[in-house]
Amino acid sequence: THPGIYGSSILGEADQRIQIILLDTRYFRDDLDRNTLTDQEKKDVGKVGWYQPTTDTSRTLLGEPQWVWLKTQLRKPAKVRIIVSSIQTISWEKGMECWGNMPHQRTRLFKLIADTKAQGVVLISGDVHFAEISKTDEGPYPLYDITSSGLAQKPHPSWPKAINQYRLPGCLYVGENFGLITIDWATKTLCLQACDVQGQPQFTQNVAISALKVK
């Protein structure tokens, strides 16, 4: 046992091995910097939240013990790795809780994926009360963050209008939803979707597993 709530699991064998990594982004987290924008100023720049990126690189999101643990996990063999974060990893401009409030920690995560040569990483997140997919080329290969939320709570009307330069075209859904990742081992493809309460996909993004490798 250890402080915080984080862990990992391995599913499948050999060429169909999946690793699921659950991160704790709250227990060890240092305080966030709050912005001082008025509601109108937020609207003008596309922000909806209360926070802003810090310049204090001594602050931590995961805590050093969890970082050490994560490095060990990413070195384990797996074809697909699903990293679960309660807050968005890629998108950072909204002013909401996200990895981008500590830019040095966000950068550290991307660098750790590269340094450990961890292939097949896909990020999943929630918290924002709508669904979207963000993509960045800041990692060793294209990184995708599929965000889904919530199952039983409608979004605030302004939140889906928040800025996100990383959002893939067509990959935004406003309404109760859940995320779905389907792995097709025959075609070696990941299918990332957000589904409505009837289970109908509202957007789909296919990703070749072969594209998620450190060169």
What are these regions (language model features)?
Residues 1-215:
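Metal-dependent phosphoester/phosphodiester hydrolase catalytic core
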